[in-house]
Amino acid sequence: MESITIENYVFPSTMVNPPGSTNTFFLAGAGNRGLEIEGKFVKFTAIGVYLEESALPFLAAKWKSKSSEELANSLDFFRDIVTGPFEKFTRVTMILPLTGKQYSEKVAENCVAHWKAIGTYTDAESQAIEKLLNIFQNETFPPGASILFTQSPVGALTISFIKDDSITGTGNAVIENKQLSEAVLESIIGKHGVSPAAKCSIAERVSGLFKKSYADASVFEKPGIEKSSDPVIEEKPTIPEIGV
C-alpha cells in the first residue's frame, strides 16, 4: 500500500501504536475538508483514517463483492466502519490555522443535533460533550499541527494533540463514551461527513484490498510520517454539508 499526500502532508500507509493503542493500523483512506467560499474551494484540514488490521476480514465478509463506486455510495458500508468491532485511528492535520474552541464547538453542535434527532441524547452524552469542550478549550492549531483520535470499540475515545509529525506516547485525554467515540468518525465519513474526498479514498483503497489475496498482499509496511515537497494534484470533492 502507498501513502497518501494531501496538501504536502503525508499520511503513511501504516501506523503502529498510536496514542491509546498497542495495535497496528493500515491507512484506509485520506482526503481534505473544505468549503466553497466566494466561489473558491478553501481547504481547512487534511484527514487520514486508519483501521486496525482485523477490520479488513470483518468488512470483506459483507462488502468484498462490491465495487469502489458501490462502496462510496453506501451509507451502510461507512456505518460498518464506524461501528465495527475494531479500533480506528483518525489524524486531522491543519492546512489553515484553527482554534480548539472553534473545532470542538462545531463537533459538539453536530453530535448533539444528531443524537437529539435519533433520541439517544442522555446525561452521559451531555457530560461527554462538556469534557470534549474542556479538553479543546485552550488549544490552538497552526498549519501542520494535528488532532489525533483513537477510537476503541468498547467506547473509549483517546484524544491527542501534536505540533509536528511525532505520533507517539499517551493521549492528552480519554473520554469514556461510546456514542461520542463513534460520532467523531461519523462526522467525517458518515451521511453528512465533512470529507467526501476521504470517503471516496476509503472506498477505492478498501475495494482494492478486497481484491488482493490475503496470502500475497501485505497492507503493512514500515510506518513513518514525513512532509513532502512534491506537488499533489487532487480532484475537487463534493462540498460538505456540515461540520468542521
From Swiss-Prot:
Family matches, as InterPro entries: CFI, Chalcone_isomerase, Chalcone_isomerase_3-sand, Chalcone_isomerase_bundle_sf, Chalcone_isomerase_sf
Enzyme class, UniProt record, top EC level: isomerase
Transmembrane stretches, start-end: none
One Pfam family, short name: Chalcone
GO molecular function: chalcone isomerase activity
Catalytic activity: a chalcone = a flavanone
GO BP terms in the entry: flavonoid biosynthetic process
Protein family membership: Belongs to the chalcone isomerase family.
Source taxonomy: Eukaryota, Viridiplantae, Streptophyta, Embryophyta, Tracheophyta
Keywords assigned: Flavonoid biosynthesis, Isomerase
Protein's recorded name: Chalcone--flavanone isomerase
Keyword NADP: no
Gene (UniProt): CHI
Site (Important for catalytic activity): Y103
Organism expressing this protein natively: Nicotiana tabacum (Common tobacco)
Ligand binding (substrate): T45, N110, S187
Functional summary from the UniProt entry: Catalyzes the intramolecular cyclization of bicyclic chalcones into tricyclic (S)-flavanones. Responsible for the isomerization of 4,2',4',6'-tetrahydroxychalcone (also termed chalcone) into naringenin.
Enzyme Commission number(s) of this protein: 5.5.1.6
Annotated pathway: Secondary metabolite biosynthesis; flavonoid biosynthesis
Miscellaneous comment as given in the Swiss-Prot or TrEMBL entry: Part of the biosynthetic pathway for all classes of flavonoids, a large class of secondary plant metabolites, many of which are brightly colored.
